[in-house]
Amino acid sequence: MKIKTRFAPSPTGYLHVGGARTALYSWLFARHHGGEFVLRIEDTDLERSTPEAIEAIMDGMNWLNLEWDEGPYFQTKRFDRYNAVIDEMLEAGTAYKCYCSKERLEQLREEQMAKGEKPRYDGRCRHSYEHHADDEPCVVRFANPQDGSVIFDDQIRGPIEFSNQELDDLIIRRTDGSPTYNFCVVVDDWDMEITHVIRGEDHINNTPRQINILKALNAPVPMYAHVSMINGDDGKKLSKRHGAVSVMQYRDDGYLPEALLNYLVRLGWSSGDQEIFTREEMIKLFSLGAVSKSASAFNTDKLLWLNHHYINTLEPEYVATHLQWHIEQENIDTRNGPQLAELVKLLGERCKTLKEMAQSCRYFYEDFSEFDADAAKKHLRPVARQPLEVVRDKLSAITDWSAENVHHAIQATADELEVGMGKVGMPLRVAVTGAGQSPALDVTVHAIGKTRSIERINKALGFIAERESQQ
């Protein structure tokens, strides 16, 4: 049997991390078994579905590199198919027209709740032989079995059973002629030959209804696996107050897709004590049997740790392709300065996100108008004038501009003046970067460049002279 899974989001908002994890698990299961992965957009909610949400879902899937083999299919383009199946069910007697008014249904609901009963349709029109005009408004309901039970072997949770007496006759077509979500899903899974439905636990109650419709259609019933929800680190359902919940917001915040995927796969699944997984390892090791039944807690600190790991272990050239977007957001012109791959090497240890990296690299490419006030007050004092003058001259004398030779120039200055390296290094750091923190000074000065470094030292000396004149 060829394994075939699907990810079927509703385009009523962004792709959130819970949906992304479901997509990842479905994708991994298909890839592990050499099967196929289908993307389906469940846009039957015409009022809430938007083109912007569809684009956001596609952007998120593409950024995570969860490529699909079929689709995207859109349910709104398949209404003719759904209605044809409903008409066949009406002919076969597995569905019927219901003419009950909203007022009657509301009264029925209130009476049942007053008795402490679960609200459900009482089947009045199922057994009615009243004549109705062809144009009289009605819905179509599925004639759910009235006895027995539905049992399915959830691939994560084990056997789950529902009594058919708990299930009412589901509306499968509205009065406006549009098919409903639960029915469209069934026909789609049937037509697309889906073998395994992997989705959130909030769909468990839909499953027996969908299985009954499939059986009424003499269609194969797929295997089901329901993934537990994701909570915040406080144990409550994950929401915006816990931080970002949109996949693309994590992109905007400077995370690499590899970090988010690695984090999401471990959010409910494990393989021994292993924490770091390549995509190839995920595909090789993934199984539904190792997915936890319990809710997972989202831990941003752990995700940040993973992101820092990947910034420093992936190829710098690859990381640079993702850094480029953040550089553009900061409006930094990188034509006059180090290559971005070199920047990744320089700042990788110091920066946990690409956004942080982009926001802290401007001095490599652009001159600054003023020094950081605290750093200048502490390190650009009259006592720093001589070390800066000497190191400037030694840097000017370098013919082979390299980090090693820059280091020798700084060391030689300290030796000549018989002072510690900090007496030279800290004023030099503030002079060339404008601030008191940077990567190793020799590689920083080398990356900034000879001409620009000397110009900035002269600017710092001018700052010191002005400071002296005001004393």
Curated annotation (Swiss-Prot):
Keywords: Aminoacyl-tRNA synthetase, ATP-binding, Cytoplasm, Ligase, Metal-binding, Nucleotide-binding, Protein biosynthesis, Zinc
UniProt enzyme class: ligase
Family to which the UniProt record says this protein belongs: Belongs to the class-I aminoacyl-tRNA synthetase family. Glutamate--tRNA ligase type 1 subfamily.
Full protein name: Glutamate--tRNA ligase
Catalytic activity annotation: tRNA(Glu) + L-glutamate + ATP = L-glutamyl-tRNA(Glu) + AMP + diphosphate
Residues noted as binding ATP in the record, renumbered to the chain: 240
NCBIfam families reported in the protein's UniProt record: gltX_bact
GO molecular-function terms, A-Z: ATP binding; glutamate-tRNA ligase activity; tRNA binding; zinc ion binding
Gene name of this polypeptide: gltX
Cofactor: Zn(2+)
Record flagged with keyword Cytoplasm: yes
